[in-house]
Structures are given as structure tokens and as C-alpha cells.
Amino acid sequence: MRDMLGLMKQAQAMQEKIQQMQAEIERLEVEGQSGGGMVRVTLSAKGQLRNLAIDDQLIKADEKQILEDLIITAHEDARKKAERLMEEKMQGVTAGLALPPGMKLPF
């Protein structure tokens, strides 16, 4: 019975930490870039596009396809950074828990 109570307290404390972490994650941003910084995207840690910056040199009609490819690459770069950032932040919250390998918490 004592073990069950301790487990419930641990679960409640973890839930509070997760809620705090979610609030912090909402405020975090990452930047991805491509083309040597000519295209930059800023994403929230959850992957929402917050800003797109394109160097003036790229805005030419005959380079439309290049620009589109660079935007996609910059977005993917930022998305990967956001994913790594969330994983790093959650490691502190889930430290000490016996989670199965590869298990991701729902955010």
C-alpha cells in the first residue's frame, strides 16, 4: 500500500513537471537555414512556422524552383532542431522513470 501511494505521488509530480515543460516548450523557438543562410525559417519547438526570411538575391523569377527547395530544406533543418530540443528538455522530466526504449510522451 505504501508503495502504491509513493507511486501515485511520483506520477502526480511528473504530471506537474510535464505541464511546466509544455508551457516552456511553447515559448521556445529554433531557426533552420539553407543556402548558406540565404533562407531562414523560425519554428516553435512544436514545429509551427513563425518566421520566414529570404535574402533579396534569391527573389528572381528564373530561380523560383531553387528558392522553393531552399525553403523546404530550411524548414526541415528547423524541424529537426525542434525535435532534438524537445527530446533534451523531456530527458530532465523523465529522468529516473523506467520508460521503454523509444517511447515518446504525448507532445
From Swiss-Prot:
Keywords: Cytoplasm, DNA-binding. GO terms for molecular function: DNA binding. It is found in: Cytoplasm, Nucleoid. It holds the Pfam family YbaB_DNA_bd. Homodimer. HAMAP family: DNA_YbaB_EbfC. Binds to DNA and alters its conformation. May be involved in regulation of gene expression, nucleoid organization and DNA protection. Belongs to the YbaB/EbfC family. This is Nucleoid-associated protein Msil_0275.
